[in-house]
Amino acid sequence: MRLAPDLIAHNGRVITIDASARIADAFAIKDGRFIAVGGGPALLAAADAQTTIIDLKGRAVVPGLIDGHAHLDREGLREVYPSLAGAASIDDILQRIEALVRTSKPGAWIVTMPIGEPPSYWNMPAGLAEKRWPTRYDLDKVSPNNPVFIRPVWGFWRHDFSPLVSIANTRALEIAGIDRNTEPPVPAITIERDASGEPTGVFAERTLQPIVELTLMRCIGGFTHEDRLQGLRRSIEVYHATGTTSVYEGHGVAPEVLAAYQQLHARGELTMRSDLVFSPSWSLVPDVPIATMLDRWAGWIAGRGLGDDMLRMAGMFCEVTANAEENRLRASAHPYTGWAGFHYDQQLPPDRLIEAMVACARNDIRVVTLTMEMMPHIEAANRIEPIRDKRWVLSHIGIMNDDQIARVRDLGLVTSTNSNRYIYRSGSNFLKQVGEARADEIMPMAKLRDAGIKVSLATDNVPTSLFHPVWQAVARKDRDTGAVIAPEQRVSRMDALRNATIDGAYLSMNEANKGSIEVGKLGDFAVLSADPLSCAEDDLKDLSAEITVVGGHVVYRQTA
């Protein structure tokens, strides 16, 4: 029997993230797990001809990063449709469309990504030379016969609450049956019209999740299974390049996304450890008591659910109904979920929501939800069936006062936060909202740490690198003003790295198995482009992985 390690990394600064914050020089992996940490010369002496040896050459190593709210599947989907990035004018956009027409079959749909620069598609149409959106009449000049649809932004990429705009040419409107008599299905949608009352092809939606492409323009089609499969492959590559080795998908995962994960896993291609949460489609549930359904579902989502160290489904997403009619319309596209990847009808009215959460508590089904607005409902369920030790999850935590922090602590909730939104993109806006006297309530990382509440950092897919949230937790700088938002809530670099590693493992109820470089844990790590403990503060956001390893296998290596 071979006793030598499968992999040895030595001559580096290994930031172990163990309880003592140890910095080691080396480690060894065998059969997918760390078998030794420290003592580089002795480890090298144990190597044989089959051992992979990585000379770190002084570089920093961290445990594989764990994204606490990743929406991993979306990243690769951005490449399904042609990009309009770099288009600075309507003429630039028309040139792109014209080129697509030349390579398309007559009458074939031409569907593109939104106008603007990914990932946020910010400052449009002000960023175009004409300071306006193109219309059907513009698009008709280069595509009179092929239907054209420019997709809207997924609102959570931007978070500035400006309308989501999509644009169709005349042929697309004809196929969709949209004319001067068409009325928007909900008040949140505006069908822009010209002076004669005809639609201009421009749709504006005052919402964060598009409705038009799932209703009025459903004829454009959507992501296929192959799109999702290829997109997931590409997403994994992108996230690995930043050192991420695990994701937690707490917003819920619909069957069409789960199918892509399962197929990659069955083929041995899934290299991202993926903890998924069940997304229920309540409109499809039989007319039986909710508790009865939860009893049935418990067999596969209770406790740690079903799966292995690479793919697992456990827990259920719960949320109170908001904008019920809008979500009903989105859900009418079932089983298609678009960018969401979760069911649009996974919300419930308050009384049924509490009933569902009580049934979850009694069946040991972990509840995952979003924002502080859910706290009264969680507390109502807790009064009926205690949840203190069940590690329910509260994601997207943003503004929290001391009383709310205490309530979260007392319920034993685990949290994740998206500093990309609450600090970087919207910090100054939140500061205006709450006032300087309450600044420390904005993503209060230091207070949460001091209260003993676990906080997992998350990207929400904008952008994909967890080093952006790490930097934002440390520096807390607003993108637009450069102001430091609530400086008293800054945390140390080591604390932020813990939020991006071991606290993410705690979120997935797997801290005994991953999240730090310790003997017996899964052999996941990333060799970094610079040392996160000593690089210039503003360089934290630009850190990347030079090598990423999952279970002792290299899954990413920087090529140039």
Task: Pin down the residues of each PLM region.
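A short helix-to-beta-strand connector/capping loop
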Residues: 49-50, 270, 306-312, 388-391, ...
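Acidic (Asp/Glu)-rich catalytic clusters
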Residues: 264-268, 300-311, 384-387, 408-410
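Short acidic, Gly/Pro-enriched loop/turn segments at secondary-structure junctions
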Residues: 403-404, 556-558
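Alpha-helical scaffolding within the catalytic cores
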Residues: 298-299, 402
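His/Asp/Glu-enriched, well-ordered alpha-helical/loop segment
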Residues: 357-370, 374-392, 396-398, 402-409, ...
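Short, well-ordered beta-strand micro-motif
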Residues: 28, 192, 306, 527, ...
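Divalent metal-binding segments
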Residues: 3-10, 15, 19-298, 310-356, ...
